[in-house]
Design a protein with these regions (language model features):
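Short, charged surface segments at domain edges that flank catalytic/cofactor-binding sites
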Residues: 1-17, 92-96
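Residue-level marker of positions within ordered structural domains that often coincide
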Residues: 11, 23, 59, 77, ...
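Long, hydrophobic, amphipathic alpha-helical segments used as structural scaffolds
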Residues: 14, 65, 114-117
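Histidine-centered nuclease catalytic patch
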Residues: 17-51, 61
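Polybasic, low-complexity binding patches
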Residues: 39-49, 59-97
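Zinc-coordinating Cys/His ligand positions in small cysteine/histidine-rich zinc-finger domains
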Residues: 54-57
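Charged phosphate-binding loop/patch that engages nucleotide di/tri-phosphates or the phosphate backbone
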Residues: 87-117
């Protein structure tokens, strides 16, 4: 649901732009790429490092790390880049209540962005 919320909120007239390659595609054909890979809980839900990426960049080109880093530095600065890289090593345990609240928040955002569940 987080992926859908990010893609819908990033879309302009239903189109998202890949942050690493620059191509534009319908939001349903775009993925939510993580700046820091590894899918650890410390960064998995940190939206400051999740942006639209095309399938080719996110999967076929393993996230386009150097290009993603340039995007992050230009738009958010070295401080956030360093923080997200450091968070990769941190374990975060969410309670069932926290996860339910996150899901409800994502559902609301999807609805507000004009999407359906």
């Amino acid at each position: 649901m987080l992926s859908k919320a990010i893609r819908l909120e990033s879309a302009r007239s239903g189109i998202c732009k890949c942050v690493t390659f620059g191509c534009s595609k319908p939001w349903k054909e775009i993925q939510a790429g993580h700046f820091v890979g590894g899918r650890t809980n410390g960064i998995l839900f940190d939206e400051r490092g999740i942006f639209p990426q095309c399938y080719a960049c996110n999967v076929c080109r393993q996230g386009m790390g150097p290009e993603y880093t340039v995007f992050m530095l230009e738009n958010y600065g070295q401080g956030l880049v360093d923080e997200l890289i450091q968070k990769r090593r941190q374990a975060v345990k969410f309670t069932a209540t926290e996860l339910k609240e996150m899901i409800e928040g994502y559902k609301l955002r999807i609805k507000e962005a004009g999407g359906t569940l």
